[in-house]
Amino acid sequence: MEQSGHEPGKNTFLSRVFGLQSDDVSTSIHTQELSTIPLDEDESNHGALVESEDDEDHNDGVRLLESDPGTSTQDSLESDTSEEDERINGINSDSQVIDTSRPLLSKKETMELHPFGSQNGRIMESSIKLGQPSSDEEDLINVNESLQPDLENRINPIYHEDKLDKALGNSSKNIRTSTFLDRVLKPNDVKKNSTKKRQNSHNYNPTSTYTNSSSNTFLNTVKGEKSSKKYKLKRPNILNALSVVNNMPERRLNTLSPKERALWKWANVDNLDLFLQDAYNYYLGNGFHCIILQKVLNILTLLFVVFVSSFMGYCVDYSKLPTSTRFSEIKIDHCYSQNITGFTKFLLFLFYGFVILKVIQLYFDINNIREMKLFYHYLLNISDDELQTIPWQNIIQQLMYLKDQNALTANVVAVKAKNKLNAHGIANRIMRKENYLIALYNNDILDLRFPIPFFGSQPLTKTLEWNINLCVMGYVFNEAGFIKQGFLKATQKEYFANELRKRFMLAGFLNIILSPFLVSYFVLLYFFRYFNEYKTSPENIGARQYTPMAEWKFREYNELYHIFRKRIGLSNPLASKYVDQFPKEKTNILLKFVSFISGSFVAILAILALWDPENFLNFEVTHDKTVLFYITVLGAIWSISQGSVSTEYHVFDPEETLRELAEYTHYLPDSWKDRYHTEGVKQEFCELYNLRITVLLRELASLITTPFILWFSLPNSAGKMVDFFRESSVYVDGLGYVCKYAVYDGDADAVKKHFGTDGNETTEQDAATEEQDIDSEPDEATKKMMQSYMYFLDDYENDDNLLGKYQIPKKRRESFDNTQYDVSNSNQKNQDDDSDMILANRYTWRKQFKPGQKPELFRIGNHVLNDKTFTQQGSNHLGIDESYARSQISNTAEESNRSSLYNSKYKSPTKGVLGLVKEYYKKSDVGR
């Protein structure tokens, strides 16, 4: 887009941050990274931004830098220093505040905005695009460069803060939920009619047909009132130290107190993704001392394996072992200087250099972890001792409290990025890459076949998974953690596909060189780790574990690792129970025979040893193999075979067991339906839940087979991978490009497919066919997304899930859930059982939508859903804003807000998010 006739005026924002005038930097900014803001025609029109009447003339707009969580740029609408001072003063007074997170409405579209009250007459066509900057691959895209004057003195306050607080307690109507889910779930005939309407509308803009429902949806907040009852936390209070944020230069950080230093770091975050990932890793690692201890012990483990193996190989004279009685007699003096020479010594020097680098990295990690400790302790008011028991939901709650106090005053961090600080946004930032990997493995994009006929597909191993992450994710995403925008251009497909092929082949070559050393190291590591376990408990050789592919198949979108690890750990007993239900008669017959033969030899040797215990034990049965050696080996074989024989009786109900197991694994393919009792389903499940010894052997074999897969097989999938990242990426304001399957809250209304098939921005025709794209989505992909959506709801809305990383819900009464509620019972009986029903009826979506049950009989929080509340609540919605501070103004409003989402429009299943979910659940097998 060309801009002419504008003099480059002074840019206050750029001059403050970079020390430059706008004309000095105008040639360094790509216009595709700017967004159009229409100028006001009438500044008195409630502070709204009004578009020029000429729809085709876009030169009247002002191009603004995109706000980005990974940069240090500030929201251009709030760049002026005087405006910032005004906002700071407005916190302590009743002055008016600009709501920068307010969505802009499309032209000629009038609707009510909630929960801020009615705002009619807002006419808008485009919205500010915030979230992700251009990547370092932008030199592949030919763009014009321009810079326009900022919107100084163009925006008037929209609402008073006291009006906002008052509105939070009021119910609102006509709340719109996620249009993305709406498109997925509503009937096909409705989709077709909607598509026709869009095709007939010449001025349709898919990015602006939404309200501010994102601030009302349950996904944008966590029920802080619930968690506060279990875990008393002090709210962050940083308003007294705000001057530090604006006035302290980085070179004087050492003069600050620990709390002020933590505040400065928070206010000057230049990459919110990396910061939240560090914060989550700190929570996952249980604090400063646990993380440092783990890192130190990892280095010591590496040193121990290499030192012991080298010492046993070069410093022991095994020829003297039979005749020696002391260790000093078989030890070789000065073995490292005399025996170790040439290539082996060179490898040891390389290893020592690697250890030195790890120690240096540990030093810098300690500094970063210490900074995170200060952030948790002083700003979130959470000590390290609490991290092992406190729920993650409380961490989110404290982050949102902190954001409410700091987002409007920080002068470096992108304000819009912090305004997206909610449960859904935080999960998307932490798992930006992992969400793509989940979709990549679930959609079977990768070709993992071994390039030899009749070998079939190679199981995914940790070694192969690590190489895929290095080759694919390390190239698709830039250093800031954002997807390179060249991958979103269809015209750049061949270029990036060729680059991926080169990376696969290079990685295969490096694996061939490193495989001998890796095989040696991991053989020793597994030997030291598992030998004593199998020696003392031989029956453990039949233990099973989930394979790496199973972990990616079972994991949900936006499911943080500690939640996934907990439910997978709880599923192990049920998985073993399911496998053990199937008879293993052929295996039992073979194991009994092996047990008999080995036991017989052990018995013979033991009886002969009684005649001459001192000499016979050293008697050589074969060359250099004594009786004691064979008694040890054959005894171990007997213990393993005898312990692996199945002698217990089990109740054979594989269908019930597998359905119960699916409550934890979230995996129950439609192809297994009506075949749960068959050997075929059992074999498919055992490929996901395999013997631990088999998994270990595959890992060792993978060190040899991985180079061939990287060299010959995976390059064939390069083009499909580029298509996958382009088709699976959507743009969300304040988040940037994320995996489309991980966007399922109210913010999905703001999702924009920024690029079309020709590499340009989306057109009206592209938007009109968006419905057809949704219809063409694979059923499994849609089910996976919907399943993740409902489990995300359960994780963050269910009282019982407000637990720490190592805690599980206590057993509760399930009598009401296990029995069908009989509406024909007498009123007296219903009154007697009312308290039992309230105690037993804890909410989960699986219970609420269980076939034959009535959703209205289930409660949420402290609110019981019944017919009376259905008639009284009407069309209330969850009017909770992103801000926890503002969401707890009125106890009455809090009580209604906790349950109103589920009360809304139950009697019309085609309206509202939960109605759509209910309608979808009736027609699918998700989660059953």
Curated annotation (Swiss-Prot):
Stretches within the membrane that do not traverse it: 508-528, 693-713
Cytoplasmic side, ranges: 1-295, 367-507, 529-588, 647-692, 714-928
Compartment(s): Preautophagosomal structure membrane; Cytoplasmic vesicle membrane; Golgi apparatus membrane; Endoplasmic reticulum membrane
A Gene Ontology biological process term: protein localization to phagophore assembly site
Catalytic function, reaction form: a 1,2-diacyl-sn-glycero-3-phosphocholine(in) = a 1,2-diacyl-sn-glycero-3-phosphocholine(out); a 1,2-diacyl-sn-glycero-3-phospho-L-serine(in) = a 1,2-diacyl-sn-glycero-3-phospho-L-serine(out); a 1,2-diacyl-sn-glycero-3-phosphoethanolamine(in) = a 1,2-diacyl-sn-glycero-3-phosphoethanolamine(out); a 1,2-diacyl-sn-glycero-3-phospho-(1D-myo-inositol-3-phosphate)(in) = a 1,2-diacyl-sn-glycero-3-phospho-(1D-myo-inositol-3-phosphate)(out)
Biased composition (Low complexity): 201-216
Acidic residues: bias regions: 77-86, 761-779
Domain notes: Forms a homotrimer with a solvated central pore, which is connected laterally to the cytosol through the cavity within each protomer. Acts as a lipid scramblase that uses its central pore to function: the central pore opens laterally to accommodate lipid headgroups, thereby enabling lipid flipping and redistribution of lipids added to the outer leaflet of ATG9-containing vesicles, thereby enabling growth into autophagosomes.
Description of how the protein assembles with itself and partners: Homotrimer; forms a homotrimer with a central pore that forms a path between the two membrane leaflets.
Protein name: Autophagy-related protein 9
Organism listed in the record: Candida glabrata (strain ATCC 2001 / BCRC 20586 / JCM 3761 / NBRC 0622 / NRRL Y-65 / CBS 138)
Lineage: Eukaryota, Fungi, Dikarya, Ascomycota, Saccharomycotina
